[in-house]
UniProtKB/Swiss-Prot annotation:
GO terms for molecular function: calcium ion binding; calcium-dependent phospholipase A2 activity; phospholipid binding; toxin activity. Disulfide bonds join C26-C115, C28-C44, C43-C95, C49-C122, C50-C88, C57-C81, C75-C86. Ca(2+) binds at Y27, G29, G31, D48. Its cofactor is Ca(2+). It catalyses: a 1,2-diacyl-sn-glycero-3-phosphocholine + H2O = a 1-acyl-sn-glycero-3-phosphocholine + a fatty acid + H(+). InterPro entries: PLipase_A2, PLipase_A2_Asp_AS, PLipase_A2_dom, PLipase_A2_dom_sf, PLipase_A2_His_AS. The lineage of its organism: Eukaryota, Metazoa, Chordata, Craniata, Vertebrata. The keyword Lipid metabolism applies. This is Basic phospholipase A2 CbII. It comes from Pseudocerastes fieldi.
Length: 122
């Protein structure tokens, strides 16, 4: 769920790091359209696509099991859609971490008018 995803992001990037990803680029935050602006925005695009493939539960609300082991996010013994949601969130949190050095503050709170290009397909 979104609370667990927040904890994953903060666990990988530090306390309150999630605040940098709430409204960044064209895809980080609610909804999304256009072309991802940078690697961070691409992480969000891929995460949105991943959630779109989940069947059988609501990715934003369903509670799954996971833990941090030696700094790595490990999804627990979840079944079906819970496993899929955990994997979506784990991959995105790792993606943010891998691209933290290219995070661009200029894309925070980006106007939707800058995201009007034809949206990419998942």
């Amino acid at each position: 769920n979104l609370f667990q995803f927040t904890k994953m992001i903060n666990g990988k990037l530090g306390a309150f790091a999630v605040l940098n990803y709430i409204s960044t680029g064209c895809y980080c935050g609610w909804g999304g359209q256009g072309t991802p602006k940078d690697a961070t925005d691409r992480c969000c695009f891929v995460h949105d696509c991943c959630y779109g493939r989940v069947k059988g539960c609501n990715p934003k609300l369903a509670i799954y099991s996971y833990s941090f082991q030696k700094g790595n996010i490990v999804c627990g013994k979840n079944n079906g859609c819970l496993r899929d949601i955990c994997e979506c969130d784990r991959v995105a949190a790792n993606c943010f971490h891998q691209n933290k050095n290219t995070y661009n503050r200029n894309y925070r709170f980006l106007s939707s008018s800058r995201c009007r290009q034809t949206s990419e397909q998942c």
